[in-house]
Amino acid sequence: MTTYKDAGVNIEEGYKAVNLIKNIAKETFDSNVITDIGSFGSMYLLNIENSDYILVSGTDGVGTKLKIAFYMDKHDTVGIDCVAMCVNDILCHGAKPLFFLDYIACGKLKSEKVATIVKGVAEGCKIAGCSLVGGETAEMPGFYREEEYDLAGFAVGLVKKDLAICGQDVKEGDILIGLASNGVHSNGYSLVRKVFGIDENPKVLTKVYEELNLSLGEELLKPTRIYVKPVLKVLEKIKIKGIAHITGGGFFENIPRAFPKGFVAVIEKGTWNILPIFRLIQKYSKVDDNEMFSTFNMGIGMVLIVSKDDVETAMEILNEEGINSYVIGTIEKGEGGVVLR
């Protein structure tokens, strides 16, 4: 069995680092900071006369998915991933993204490659309905290899104070709606690379596995789905009580961030189609379901928490917007966390 920790990613150490950072960051907070460190997005009250809006910001990167782009020399979609990771996070608080900035650091600046990357960023911004207003490109020889780069971004959005989503209205009996993912998205790639031996043999990315209808590399580079416009459409019609973006830490880490203490999310396995890529990863890694659900999105890229009466309306809108959705579980009273059944 090959776990995420075996691949070099220690999630527990990450949690420890966040807890240490929290206290440092809190020393800088003023009275306009609404959310604690660890929320999907950071909420800041616009404390100006006659304003009832909150700024919501988020920052993230593409992670080691970039290694796949390096090996395949394909750089046109990782920019979409970068935007998705940021705007999907601030969407969890009901915010409409306003603008985006990117940061590219590379070993050797190659203008055409950078332009290709940024074209993907711009495409992501178009999908999300926000503006790419600036960024930074840093050439750092001796720090990165010549053919390698890192890509991160920063998004800012806006939500009316009385419409901000923080999970405060979640109650027992509420329903969890899962929104279909487009594949692995942008998390779990350290484990993926280890499981398939990609770093030792990059040519494996050209292999077409029986479970997939395209090469492994093409499957792994599918861009992260951006949920902004479909979810904002749902918000026009119903109240969404909580939203979770399923990223690093999978179901177990992210779904509990969408509701307060005293509840547990009960997930019914088998209520949606787990994508073939995840079956393939599990086959080769030999890890159990809990490890898979704590590492990957398993075919669900975002989870909405709504009242029973609003489920049908929400799913109809999502279907109209081209997003497959599933009732995947319920909210029950409990000690917190996620239970898989």
From Swiss-Prot:
This is Phosphoribosylformylglycinamidine cyclo-ligase. It catalyses: 2-formamido-N(1)-(5-O-phospho-beta-D-ribosyl)acetamidine + ATP = 5-amino-1-(5-phospho-beta-D-ribosyl)imidazole + ADP + phosphate + H(+). InterPro entries: PurM-like_C_dom, PurM-like_C_sf, PurM-like_N, PurM-like_N_sf, PurM_cligase. It comes from the Bacteria. It is found in: Cytoplasm. One of its GO terms (cellular component) is cytosol. SUPFAM superfamilies: PurM C-terminal domain-like, PurM N-terminal domain-like. GO terms for molecular function: ATP binding; phosphoribosylamine-glycine ligase activity; phosphoribosylformylglycinamidine cyclo-ligase activity. One of its GO terms (biological process) is adenine biosynthetic process. Belongs to the AIR synthase family. Keywords: ATP-binding, Cytoplasm, Ligase, Nucleotide-binding, Purine biosynthesis. Pathway: Purine metabolism; IMP biosynthesis via de novo pathway; 5-amino-1-(5-phospho-D-ribosyl)imidazole from N(2)-formyl-N(1)-(5-phospho-D-ribosyl)glycinamide: step 2/2. The keyword Metal-binding does not apply. The keyword Nucleus does not apply. It comes from Caldicellulosiruptor saccharolyticus (strain ATCC 43494 / DSM 8903 / Tp8T 6331). Its EC number is 6.3.3.1. Pfam families: AIRS, AIRS_C.
